[in-house]
Amino acid sequence: MDCYRTSPSNSWIYTTVILCIFGFFSMMRPSEPFLIPYLSGPDKNLTSEEMTNEIFPVWTYSYLVLLLPVLVLTDYVRYKPVIILQGISFIITWLLLLFGQGVKTMQVVEFFYGMVTATEVAYYAYIYSVVSPEHYQRVSGYCRSVTLVAYTAGSVLAQLLVSLANLSYFYLNVISLASVSVAFLFSLFLPMPKKSMFFHAKPSREIKKSSSVNPVLEETHEGEAPDCEKQKPTSEIPSTSGKLHKGQLNSLKPRNVTVEVFVQWFQDLKECYSSKRLFYWSLWWAFATAGFNQILNYVQILWDYKSPSQDSSIYNGAVEATATFGGAVAAFAVGYVKVNWDLLGELALAVFSVVNAGSLFLMHYTANIWACYAGYLIFKSSYMLLITIAVFQIAVNLSVERYALVFGINTFIALVIQTIITVIVVDQRGLNLPISIQFLVYGSYFAVIAGIFLMRSMYIIYSTKSQKDVQSPAPSENPDMSHPEEESNAIMSTKL
């Protein structure tokens, strides 16, 4: 049982390898692209209405209810127990998928899958407690890349087994169960961290900027920095008063430390969201992520509606693999694009939100399954491109701790929005719309997002132009004279 508490090695390489193996097998789930054909087929005999209006909404509700408690618990218990909990939830989910029957059982499946997605935060946060700051960027890149590779590999494997070997969907779920079981076993061998970002932080440690957190964050943003970056890092919460020394900190009751943590969280979030740039990028993140998750949750039902799996060959695995790969390429390519994001960022959000809306309208109006697949490819790739930019714009001037806070709150707000959409559009207690009409609503939703950010971008461009006109030197002045104030107001382009 020592594997729960100790590690055979303190090397960051050992930790990274174990974590990446866990990430690979937890995401290598070939059954996912064919979940709807499996549930609607002879194994489960569920109707489209039951899946859409009764079963799938449970995932959204459970994810929302579990997210905030899990975020707090993850830091308090120092990550590893939550990663193990995720592995257990994976196993329960697929055992119920394989051997459970009926709507109620599938609702329980969705609850445990909500637990899986809520505990996913531990996988990404774990590395910052066991890996030294100079390795943050590299390890973060490994952990994120391996999940994309695993999901793509699982989708390709599923398509090959279904199309060439005519394998039953049931056995795809058996393979997924075996994969997540391997992930659970490897989670037991992760080293137990001695510290965490907040509740078990070391007051004296140096805080690295989040430019070393994400592999796309390579340079410091040269525009206006939000005020929150100038404040004391959240990891120093127990000593924020300036009067608590180490000995006094150890004598504090846990309840008092917890109160200090929550108070500091509130102050940090208030300061961070006071930055207009961070606020608007976070606003797009929340609304777009809510819509994106909703599409992922219901797109297979739309495909089955356009081309029933019992009557025709389906290529869900190939489409998911292509979409994931295309999104990864788009996210990688944006790191080499020089754009003045301060000036044109909101315009980019508006333009690509129009693209998202158009792709969803295409998926609604077309009767051709291949056009529907194409719309999904465009939608997923453009979202992954934009979310990469949004992560950079939000995180570039924040400490690791404050980025984690903003990320958690943005995700929670996205879930609140998604829950509202689900209750109104999907749930049988709401409008209970058929799946095709739902995608018309989702397309309109992204069109509204595009309109909001188009107006915002035009305001920024007009304000910047007016400011430059006011600051322009008079014609009679010496053109060789330098103007420090003009240089300080120039907005530099940023290379991601």
Swiss-Prot record:
Keywords: Glycoprotein, Membrane, Transmembrane, Transmembrane helix, Transport. It comes from the Eukaryota. Gene3D superfamilies: MFS general substrate transporter like domains. It catalyses: thiamine(out) + H(+)(in) = thiamine(in) + H(+)(out); pyridoxine(out) + n H(+)(out) = pyridoxine(in) + n H(+)(in). Disulfide bonds: none annotated. Residues 29-53, 103-110, 166-169, 304-316, 364-375, 427-434 are extracellular. Residues 1-7, 75-81, 132-144, 191-282, 338-342, 397-405, 456-496 are cytoplasmic. Residues 218-233 have a biased composition (Basic and acidic residues). It is a multi-pass membrane protein. Glycans are attached at residues 45, 166. Residues 234-248 have a biased composition (Polar residues). GO terms for cellular component: plasma membrane. The record marks 86-87, 91, 93-94, 168, 173 as: Essential for pyridoxine transport. Coiled coil: none annotated. It holds the Pfam family Folate_carrier. It is found in: Membrane. InterPro entries: Folate_carrier, MFS_trans_sf, ThTr-2. The chain crosses the membrane at residues 8-28, 54-74, 82-102, 111-131, 145-165, 170-190, 283-303, 317-337, 343-363, 376-396, 406-426, 435-455. NCBIfam families: rfc. Mediates high affinity thiamine uptake, probably via a proton anti-port mechanism. Has no folate transport activity. Mediates H(+)-dependent pyridoxine transport. Belongs to the reduced folate carrier (RFC) transporter (TC 2.A.48) family. PANTHER family: FOLATE TRANSPORTER, THIAMINE TRANSPORTER 2. This is Thiamine transporter 2.
